[in-house]
Amino acid sequence: MDLQKQLEELKISTQEKLKEMTGNHTKELQDLRVQVLGKKGSLTELLKGLKDLSNDLRPVVGKQVNEVRDILTKAFEEQAKVVEAAKIQAQLESESVDVTLPGRQMTLGHRHVLTQTSEEIEDIFLGMGFQVVGGFEVEKDYYNFERMNLPKDHPARDMQDTFYITEEILLRTHTSPVQARTMDQHDFSKGPLKMISPGRVFRRDTDDATHSHQFHQIEGLVVGENISMGDLKGTLQLISQKMFGAERKIRLRPSYFPFTEPSVEVDVSCFKCGGKGCNVCKQTGWIEILGAGMVHPSVLEMSGIDSEKYSGFAFGLGQERIAMLRYGINDIRGFYQGDVRFTDQF
């Protein structure tokens, strides 16, 4: 067959094959390129026939070979773009999103139940004219114990198993150190001190359903002239009604705390049975919610406050206990495990 005719047929047949290739023929395109333009391809084989041509015809056919090579090389490059574009389009179509479909419902986050409880309690006290004061979680032994009428040899220190960092530095066991620091700075000539100190505290307890090595407290303090036990009871009565319902009553039972004298445990009438007796109040009609008392004169004197002129009351409650009572939670560990099945309930 005439070499020029073979070149023309190779060009035409290759162009026709290229037109048939789409995005699914990436490998076939590469194979055809090697078959036609490769070192052992069809065009190379035809090129070998140049040696058999006459001197006059060889340049003419050689030029035609180069033209065919250029045409086919360009054709392969263009078809490669077409194949790749078709491949991308097919992928886009397979992964396309139907914009008419309803969107997925977004799950919104919300405040943790302990945060909700803390903010609600803080709002109650802010409405009563108290200030909210924060403090250090890593505290000095002096402020945590000695300023609370607990010297180093006091037996009541055994009531609070403590995380010590050094002999004088510890993780606070209550937020009372905030009260001591605030009393040091308060100017009583401008009026009484009314404050609460919410925050996280730490004790060396074994974690179980009712105990945790860390928990949250809100402690309150009022110091001024002529502050009495009646003021304490009235304040606690109002707090209990706002937290547990307007019909709640409270009772005070004698107790002991080193930093208050006298000291009391405070119970609230059961909000589930109304005081008749149920499983929540253990058939007593009352639920213990906090400890309180009149500030010990020694605590006032250590802040440079004249205990003959000024008196005060203090109280402390656990946020976890309040939340557990209000929402019927029976395991304190649920607050800290990060299980959304628990937190989403609130």
Swiss-Prot record:
Annotated binding of Mg(2+), by residue: E261
Pfam families on file: Phe_tRNA-synt_N, tRNA-synt_2d
Top-level lineage group: Bacteria
InterPro entries linked to this entry: aa-tRNA-synth_II (IPR006195), aa-tRNA-synth_II/BPL/LPL (IPR045864), Phe-tRNA-synth_IIc_asu (IPR004529), Phe-tRNA_ligase_II_N (IPR004188), Phe_tRNA_ligase_alpha1_bac (IPR022911), Phenylalanyl-tRNA_Synthase (IPR002319), tRNA-bd_arm (IPR010978)
UniProt EC number: 6.1.1.20
Keyword rRNA processing (UniProt): no
UniProt-annotated location(s): Cytoplasm
Cofactor(s) listed: Mg(2+)
Free-text comment on the cofactor: Binds 2 magnesium ions per tetramer.
Catalytic reaction annotation: tRNA(Phe) + L-phenylalanine + ATP = L-phenylalanyl-tRNA(Phe) + AMP + diphosphate + H(+)
GO MF annotations in UniProt: ATP binding; catalytic activity, acting on a protein; magnesium ion binding; phenylalanine-tRNA ligase activity; transferase activity; tRNA binding
Keywords linked to the UniProt accession: Aminoacyl-tRNA synthetase, ATP-binding, Cytoplasm, Ligase, Magnesium, Metal-binding, Nucleotide-binding, Protein biosynthesis
PROSITE patterns: AA_TRNA_LIGASE_II
GO CC annotations on file: cytoplasm
A GO BP annotation: phenylalanyl-tRNA aminoacylation
NCBIfam families given in the database record: pheS
Assembly description: Tetramer of two alpha and two beta subunits.
PANTHER family reported in the protein's UniProt record: PHENYLALANINE--TRNA LIGASE, MITOCHONDRIAL, PHENYLALANYL-TRNA SYNTHETASE
Family the UniProt entry places it in: Belongs to the class-II aminoacyl-tRNA synthetase family. Phe-tRNA synthetase alpha subunit type 1 subfamily.
Name assigned to this protein: Phenylalanine--tRNA ligase alpha subunit
Gene behind this protein: pheS
